[in-house]
């Protein structure tokens, strides 16, 4: 593949066309530096409202604002050339009406340069999804555990582990699919349910605590790098950077206190200026 082809930005329709094909690789990112590192290796980068908890120390995603999503979304877009960038619509920015949802989504896309938005909810949000898609906004759905609803759910525990709840989530996924979502995130649901949804809906599914049968997978970058304090069951740590960072900081602190840093190679010598020769 040519370098020119490599530089082309992946689009929502291209992700939608991946149903049943090569698995879709997704991760979160909240700033340009990590986004740049991810860009060559992933298909989708989600600027998730999880940034409230990961980057800003919030207890839940509920306090996250549209302005926060735009700032982080813009940074991620700047750091990438290839991956599809999807930005979460935060709690309270799209639920009241279809018009509110469109204005928020349009603002996010225009001010960040992202290629799609994501919103949470099943049947209750299906008409909103349809309204957005009909007006040119690519929408990624999200069913199962929906963190924005934590105050009504009561916990971050897995969903769909009994027949009644599984039936509700299945109907939610069907509704979002029929409304035109180009993909659907399945978060923290029973594996057989994730497998069944993947088999039954037309858009590709992206699992996070779902099933290996999903059409793709996503994780929070900081969790898989070993930087998260509370790591869910569905996370595999591919690195353990937390202790490495702490060790590096401790070494730096020791050297500063011992005045061994900065050493000579880290400092600048004065520029020597040759004096003009004296006339004889």
UniProtKB/Swiss-Prot annotation:
Organism per entry: Xanthobacter autotrophicus (strain ATCC BAA-1158 / Py2)
Assembly behavior: Homodecamer; pentamer of dimers.
Cofactor: Mg(2+)
Keyword Transcription: no
An annotated Gene Ontology molecular function: 3-methyl-2-oxobutanoate hydroxymethyltransferase activity
GO biological process: pantothenate biosynthetic process
Protein origin, superkingdom: Bacteria
One GO CC term on file: cytoplasm
Amino-acid positions noted as binding Mg(2+) in the UniProt annotation, renumbered to this chain: 49, 88, 120
CDD domains in the record: KPHMT-like
One Pfam family hit: Pantoate_transf
Pathway annotation: Cofactor biosynthesis; (R)-pantothenate biosynthesis; (R)-pantoate from 3-methyl-2-oxobutanoate: step 1/2
Disulfide bonds: none
Cofactor binding note: Binds 1 Mg(2+) ion per subunit.
Protein name: 3-methyl-2-oxobutanoate hydroxymethyltransferase
EC number: 2.1.2.11
Subcellular location: Cytoplasm
InterPro entries cross-referenced by the UniProt entry: Pantoate_hydroxy_MeTrfase, Pyrv/PenolPyrv_kinase-like_dom, Pyrv_kinase-like_dom_sf
Cited function: Catalyzes the reversible reaction in which hydroxymethyl group from 5,10-methylenetetrahydrofolate is transferred onto alpha-ketoisovalerate to form ketopantoate.
UniProtKB keywords: Cytoplasm, Magnesium, Metal-binding, Pantothenate biosynthesis, Transferase
């Amino acid at each position: 593949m040519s370098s020119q082809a490599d530089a082309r930005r992946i689009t929502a329709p291209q992700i939608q066309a991946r149903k049943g094909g090569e698995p879709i690789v997704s991760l979160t990112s909240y700033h340009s530096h990590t986004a740049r590192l991810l860009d060559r290796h992933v298909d989708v980068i989600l600027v998730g409202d999880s940034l409230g908890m990961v980057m800003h120390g919030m207890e839940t995603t509920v306090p996250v604002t549209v302005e926060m999503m735009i700032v982080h979304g813009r940074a991620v877009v700047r750091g990438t050339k290839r991956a599809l960038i999807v930005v979460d619509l935060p709690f309270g920015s799209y639920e009241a009406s279809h018009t509110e949802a469109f204005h928020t989504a349009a603002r996010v896309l225009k001010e960040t340069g992202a290629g799609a938005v994501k919103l949470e909810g099943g049947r209750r949000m299906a008409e909103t999804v349809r309204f957005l898609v009909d007006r040119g906004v690519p929408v990624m759905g999200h069913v199962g555990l929906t963190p924005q609803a934590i105050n009504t759910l009561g916990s971050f525990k897995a969903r769909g582990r009994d027949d009644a709840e599984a039936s509700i989530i299945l109907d939610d996924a069907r509704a979002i699919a029929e409304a035109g979502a180009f993909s659907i995130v399945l978060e923290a649901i029973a594996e057989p349910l994730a497998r069944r949804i993947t088999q039954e809906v037309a858009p590709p599914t992206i699992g996070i605590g779902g099933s290996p049968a999903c059409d793709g997978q996503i994780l929070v970058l900081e969790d898989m790098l070993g930087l998260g304090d509370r790591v869910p069951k569905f996370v595999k740590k591919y690195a353990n950077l937390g202790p490495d960072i702490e060790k590096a900081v401790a070494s730096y602190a020791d050297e500063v206190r011992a005045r061994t840093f900065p050493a000579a190679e880290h400092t600048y010598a004065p520029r020597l200026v040759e004096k003009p020769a004296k006339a004889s």
